[in-house]
Amino acid sequence: MPPSPDFEAFSLTPIDQANGQVFFFYNISYRVRNEASALQTIHNAIDVLLEKVPFLNGEIAFPAPVPDANNVLIVRPPRAKSEDQVPLVQVKRHSNCALPVKKLEQSPFNVPSSLPLNGLFNPLAAYPTPNRPTPVIRFQINLVNDGLILTLAFNHAVFDALGAAVIVKLLAESCRNQDKIGMDGRLGIPSTQARVRSPLLALSSRLKKNNRARVDAPSPSEFSENISHRPVAAPPPLKDECFVFCAEKLQQLRIACTSILEKLHENQKSVTGQGDVRFLSINDVLTALICESIAQARHAAKHPYRDEKLHAKPSVSECLMAVDLRKFVEPPLPHDYMGNAAIPLRFEVSSQRHASPDFHRAVREVPTGLNTSFFLAIAKTAYTIRAKLARFGESYIDSLSSFLNAHEEQKAVNILPACAIVSSLRHIKTYELQFGAELGEIQAFETGIPWVNGSCIILPLCANSSDVAGSAPWNVRITLDESTMYCFKNEPALRWALLEQGKSKVLGPCDCKADV
């Protein structure tokens, strides 16, 4: 592989650095007829991609530290290679492995396998070695019995999920036409200047400077002393699985929730002063259903035996949903902006399922098979999500400031994980991409965060045409601790919303079931 052109080093934004150096992975499955030709196509495409976007072959490092200065991470051209450096592209063969793809019966759609993500497909570990330069991206081509899986590892300190999706789109272009990538007018090449001159850089830098004046962070010695005296419990074993939700059921749920918007508006306005909500999306109700089900599962996992005294006191859990800032900042960021531009939107869910009689009377029709109390909980949470999104353009600066401030305070306090952390990639049209004759269409696109308890990734639309998009299932990769996962998979609302083949009851060490 020829060396990529040099580029001018640039600093990462405060929001980039707040996400930390951790690698996320995109797994893209293809069925190929000629393995050698497919491999050559990918290698050539990566060469072209690096020629057009050379910083992708860069590395992240601290510049020479300056005393009493705000030392920031930079992306720079790679230095001399070391023997233990992970190659830019690796090829590995996996005996007795098949593509992690499942064909739905009587359906034109492929969905990802429900099995856990295979870490052997990743070119490097999720967490890089501390105090050493780390790569921006790495690729691994995994050869299996019926095709290949191209894994893209991207450093979250440089890209968010949408930024990494731009790389996939550029790679598809370079596979199709390796001489004219980015020259057809539909997608230009994002430059490093777009990052340096980004309004998000100026805004986040200003907010972080203001935050630093207010935060009294401890010295490194104080931090070490606090950590050494703090008891640390071993994290519970985690499980990740892809859940396939029925598009028709979710549409029924959205329509039913929309039918009580007026009542929800009256209730929420009196409680929180939230503005009016005119519509709910399927993304809203699915996020609400997932968060409500996980909250119930966590509550049930803590109290596996139905002790009324324990269940009498409901628990309130905080959930997070990633929101893209690209269209909110002024001027708006381009859609192909590769840097981090997502911050969390926070909302709460309660394990209590007792709605007022007025609410029950307002419900004209609950989808068959769904408990009325749980339906109302989903509707309320979906309303809260949509109301917060409607006001996000007015409040995102405060949210961004809080996000950056929390990053500063992680040195002083123990940041507890959320009940559920939802990110939606549904709108990314990955399956419509064409990768040329040797690779063809994507058979499945997978990603997840199997090391984060509560992470929920709504995967891209698994349809290669807008004509069938409305009936395409919703695929969600969810990671939970083992006991919560058992309870989650037995939640009635979840089983109702899944496609038929995923509805069987799961038996665990205890039959977990929260009160409804």
UniProtKB/Swiss-Prot annotation:
**Could you say which residues form the signal peptide?**
none
State which Enzyme Commission number(s) the record gives. Answer: 2.3.1.-
Reading the lineage from the top rank, the first entry is Eukaryota
- Give the pathway: Secondary metabolite biosynthesis; terpenoid biosynthesis
Q: How does it assemble?
A: Monomer.
Assigned protein family: Belongs to the fumigaclavine B O-acetyltransferase family.
Know the name of this protein?
A: O-acyltransferase ausQ
**Provenance organism:** Emericella nidulans (strain FGSC A4 / ATCC 38163 / CBS 112.46 / NRRL 194 / M139)
